[in-house]
Design a protein with these regions (language model features):
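Surface-exposed, short loops/turns at beta-strand junctions within beta-sandwich domains
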Residues: 1-2, 100-110, 209-219
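Intrinsic disorder
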Residues: 3-11, 77-79, 84, 122, ...
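Flexible, low-complexity linkers/stalks enriched in Thr/Pro that connect modular domains
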Residues: 16-45, 125-154, 234-263
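Short, solvent-exposed loop/linker segments at the N-terminal edge
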Residues: 47-58, 156-167, 265-276
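Aromatic/hydrophobic beta-strand junction motif of beta-rich domains
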Residues: 60-66, 169-175, 278-284
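Short strand-edge motifs at loop-to-beta-strand transitions and within beta-strands
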Residues: 95-99, 204-208
Length: 301
């Protein structure tokens, strides 16, 4: 049989070693402090809360925080544009970030703001915040918001002149319910809402009933203001004049019949005459701002 002998090993001591570190990282929150990324505010937040992200400002700065100790990168998406530190995203040394869009007019609408941090291992965390921009009080665009329409009773020369001799009044108006706004009506320094006397029906007709309150004579600016959740508002004002006295200046004089020509009776002031073509005389107090009319009726002797 053929004989086979294995080659003798060489013992010169040559060797080759390669090393590769493998990093296993399954967490975006590297330092374990619970903080990664947040969207914290906008300027100006004009909603009912300063943190509700509802505004009537359409040139905004968006703010948030990112945990710099997590060694991650941040991208913020607003209105379809991804902002990084290369194109408008600013991050300071404390991890406060901002995107300044004051040079961009954003149309009314709801904008999902998306902030995403990603580390070198590919772990990521995303937070989203809807920002509502609403710059119009007339939400449905029908031209109607709020109006002051009438008082009861309007006893002036016109039924719509808001001049009355009634000092126990009901004030009426309308509000557009489709605008999703709240209404406040101010009368004689008191602000009335649905919590304290303002009544609004299902058709948007509002009223404030002050028939239990005697209002002194004077001019009363009635102010009706609607405000929506974004802080937009519309105000209308109507002066209501209450005048319960004919003697405006309080001097005791209003109107008088003083004489006729010729008064041929036994007294020059007895209004008895044999003249049947007469001139009638009297006085009226011009300071009372009243109108004058005359009426005479003949009675035979």
């Amino acid at each position: 049989l053929p004989w086979w002998s294995p080659p003798s090993p060489t013992w010169a001591g040559n060797s080759k070693t390669v090393t590769q570190d493998v990093v296993i990282d399954t967490k975006i929150d590297e330092d374990g402090d619970g903080n990664t990324v947040a969207i914290t505010s906008i300027t100006q937040d004009t909603g009912s809360s300063s943190t509700d992200f509802i505004t009537n400002d359409n040139t905004l700065v968006f703010h948030g925080t990112v945990d710099l100790d997590d060694d991650s990168t941040l991208a913020v998406t607003i209105n379809g544009v991804v902002y990084t530190t290369a194109n408008g995203l600013v991050i300071d040394a404390q991890g406060n970030w901002s995107v300044d869009l004051t040079g961009t007019v954003l149309p009314d609408g709801t904008y999902p703001v998306v902030a995403t941090v990603t580390d070198v291992a590919g772990n990521s965390k995303t937070v989203t915040q809807d920002v509502v921009i609403d710059t119009k009080i007339d939400e449905d665009g029908d031209g109607n918001t709020v109006a002051i329409t009438s008082i009861t009773q309007d006893t002036g020369s016109s039924s719509t002149d808001f001049i009355t001799n009634d000092n126990t009044l009901v004030f009426h108006g309308t509000v557009d319910l489709d605008d999703n706004s709240t209404l406040a009506v101010t009368i004689n320094g008191v602000v009335y809402t649905t919590a304290n006397g303002l009544v609004i029906d299902a058709q948007g007709n509002w009223s404030v009933d002050l028939t239990g309150t005697v209002l002194p004579d004077g001019t009363y600016p009635v102010v009706a203001t609607v405000t929506d959740v974004a802080g937009n508002s519309k105000t209308v004002t109507q002066d209501v004049v209450i005048d319960t006295k004919i003697d405006e200046d309080g001097d005791g004089n209003t109107v008088a019949i003083t004489s006729i020509t010729q008064d041929t009776g036994s007294s020059s002031t007895d209004f008895i005459t044999n003249d049947n073509t007469l001139v009638f005389h009297g006085t009226v107090d011009l300071d009372d701002n009243s109108t004058f009319s005359r009426h005479h009726q003949r009675r035979g002797l």
